């Protein structure tokens, strides 16, 4: 499920920067220099137009009915999550918001603006005052490629995202807590397509998003750590635009391995990207584990519902698969399975209490290698969870 767009945004940002640096000629950069990397009103217009007939707003009645259901569902869900994880939430979840696809676009443009504003500042600082290809890249390169790319992708996601727990990553003035959002037209369409009763499917989605809320609200250090990883990734990508062409040639020649996005990164960038991927895998895997355990108690026919939903993900069309490959979102889908295998393996080996060590702080988070081989993480914890830099990769 494509849910938390702070995490989705990282993949799209990386793909966008790579495409920019690898495909635009120096002369064109110089000739078309302007003032901003992205024209956000243009991006918004492209995304909204991509929705076409699916842009219909929610009526006041539809919104009120859905909101009442989600509020009641979350009241029932919270005790089940608390029972499963063995600890209470610090406080009740904020009132959720029910939104339509157009509202989702506007909500998430703020996340992308925060990401790209950091890129813009760093590229301008690196370019200095001289009118160089680097400065031109910092100022306008994506007003042709980037506007179209981001507008297309945000419009694409606006029809796919069912719900998200928004923690305002990189926001200038983030609130003390995140908020749950449900994209009701997508939830309704998915329920109908899967032939699942709407209220049962709503509860299914609300349960997953509530587990993400627990992860962040019960462990306040997590948001700062996640934000720092994203900021580090952005800085590394923005301060080395000149090497993209060389790495592109190496990737095409087969000299580099891994996903195409990873093949276009420096070793330092790949290390940071790996830490980010590991955290995303853990968050999704833990959420899925809790959801599966609590769902059996909360939702009639949960196992069948879950299987139908998973089969839906497996039946993606060729165009959708290509889009996910190009943007790096296919990496996100792979994370669900890897993270859940890690969580299940640790619980099977040492029990749920031992798994709770993941929440002690950044030093006890598993690395990407440890996500793939849980025995390595277990061994590191039993050896004293040395420093955050030891045993990580």
Protein language model regions, located:
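Hydrophobic alpha-helical topogenic segments used for membrane insertion/localization
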Residues: 5-29
